[in-house]
């Protein structure tokens, strides 16, 4: 069936079995960052609207409801190598090659993060399928990753550039990210679309249960941080603010997945200096994390680089006020003076001032928490994100 559109006849995709192959490093149960959370919820929401296949890193896993998932492990390229410095980029590259060995019959390939961009590039060349990439962060703007990847950082930058510049469409998770993409890469501005991250409003909401706090030995009054042990996440700036915070308020760092052993050792050492710092060196399960969001006095996101910052949505959905850095996509999520406070990144003194204001004025904190929940309900549902993404796929297929 077709639909007339001016002088051009285009497929009526309402009646076509539109399908997408999503390529990702992270997929449940192996999710440790915002990009993985995004893929998890987006794929589930899209599966209500269309056919979804997910190709991901890792061992074979149980099939998710409503879609198909295929897992791919890296080739052991480095077992006999003389120089293992490049393994952190070469091993993902081997997974990218494995991902395209199985024929792709979907209408669109959608890749997330540089870890899979070469798979998308190869899929476009081999199978002629349109390619869309979602940019969750930009390698050129994360120079500290050279500490994590070593010399392979140059290869990760090349993989990202190659995938992005070959894309038929590029999704930016914030307006700020779109500006950064256009600065870093040779991409037609018309191809770059902004689709924000979302959140499951039924799942992320305030919980009255306080069992998790007791389980982890957390004080009644606490400031919550959630994120990887990474310089990007600003964890050292929050630790730098501790001397200016009340001694009876605990700073709780839910910080797993260290970038490097050196960064982990540094975080552990700094945290140990303060009796009111509680370091939880693991990725706290979602159900327990929602409880911790719900009962925190304040949520703190001190990132120095954050294209979106889905953790702020999670805290706001649980009616907790947010103090965050005025960077990237955070400024499109947290409304300064309404749902929390924004401070300049890398300034522990400013961070402490904002945190103390909310710790002292609990009525202000309550109002900001309520306003945060309302904002999330109005603008950041996954169903909305999925429909916008589905519509972009349709556009790509029509103009192919």
Predicted segments with their positions:
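Carbohydrate-associated surface elements
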Residues: 176, 198
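Short hydrophobic beta-strand element within catalytic cores of glycosyltransferases
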Residues: 298, 321-324, 334
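N-terminal subdomain of nucleotide-sugar transferases
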Residues: 1-63, 243
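Short, structured helix-loop element that forms part of the nucleotide-activated donor/catalytic region
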Residues: 247-276, 287-288, 364
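A conserved mid-protein helix/loop that constitutes part of the nucleotide-sugar donor-binding site
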Residues: 37, 221-244, 349
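Aromatic "clamp/platform" in nucleotide-sugar-dependent glycosyltransferases that forms part
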Residues: 304
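Conserved acidic donor-binding segment of nucleotide-sugar-dependent glycosyltransferases
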Residues: 336-337, 341-348, 357-363
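Short alpha-helical donor nucleotide-sugar binding micro-motif in glycosyltransferases
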Residues: 291-296
């Amino acid at each position: 069936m077709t639909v007339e559109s001016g002088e051009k006849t285009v497929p009526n995709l309402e009646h076509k079995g539109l399908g997408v192959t999503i390529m990702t490093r992270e997929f449940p149960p192996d999710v440790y960052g915002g990009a993985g959370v995004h893929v998890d919820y987006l794929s589930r929401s899209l599966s209500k609207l269309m056919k979804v296949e997910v190709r991901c890193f890792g061992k074979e896993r149980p099939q998710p409801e409503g879609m198909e998932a295929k897992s791919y492990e890296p080739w052991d390229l480095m077992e006999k190598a003389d120089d293992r410095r490049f393994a952190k980029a070469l091993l993902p590259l081997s997974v990218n090659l494995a991902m395209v060995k199985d024929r792709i019959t979907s209408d669109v390939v959608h890749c997330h993060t540089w870890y899979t961009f070469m798979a998308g590039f190869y899929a476009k060349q081999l199978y002629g399928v349109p390619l869309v990439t979602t940019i969750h962060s930009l390698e050129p703007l994360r120079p500290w990753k050279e500490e994590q990847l070593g010399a392979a950082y140059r290869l990760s930058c090349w993989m990202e550039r190659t995938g992005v510049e070959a894309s038929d469409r590029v999704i930016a998770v914030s307006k700020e990210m779109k500006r950064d993409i256009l600065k870093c890469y040779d991409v037609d501005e018309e191809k770059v679309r902004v689709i924000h991250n979302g959140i499951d409003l039924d799942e992320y909401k305030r919980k009255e249960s306080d069992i998790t706090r007791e389980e982890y030995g957390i004080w009644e009054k606490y400031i919550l941080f959630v994120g990887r042990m990474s310089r990007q996440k600003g964890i050292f700036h929050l630790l730098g603010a501790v001397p200016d915070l009340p001694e009876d308020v605990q700073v709780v760092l839910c910080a797993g997945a260290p970038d490097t052993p050196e960064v982990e050792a540094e975080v552990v050492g700094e945290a140990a200096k303060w009796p009111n710092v509680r370091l939880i060196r693991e990725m706290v399960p979602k159900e327990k994390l929602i409880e911790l969001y719900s009962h925190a006095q304040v949520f703190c996101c001190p990132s120095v680089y954050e294209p979106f910052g889905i953790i702020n949505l999670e805290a706001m959905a649980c009616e907790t006020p947010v103090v965050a850095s005025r960077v990237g996509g955070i400024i499109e999520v947290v409304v300064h003076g309404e749902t929390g406070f924004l401070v300049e990144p890398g300034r522990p003194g400013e961070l402490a001032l904002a945190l103390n204001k909310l710790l002292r004025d609990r009525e202000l904190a309550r109002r900001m928490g309520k306003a945060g929940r309302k904002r999330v309900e109005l603008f950041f549902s996954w169903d909305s994100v999925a429909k916008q993404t589905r519509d972009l796929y349709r556009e790509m297929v029509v103009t192919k």
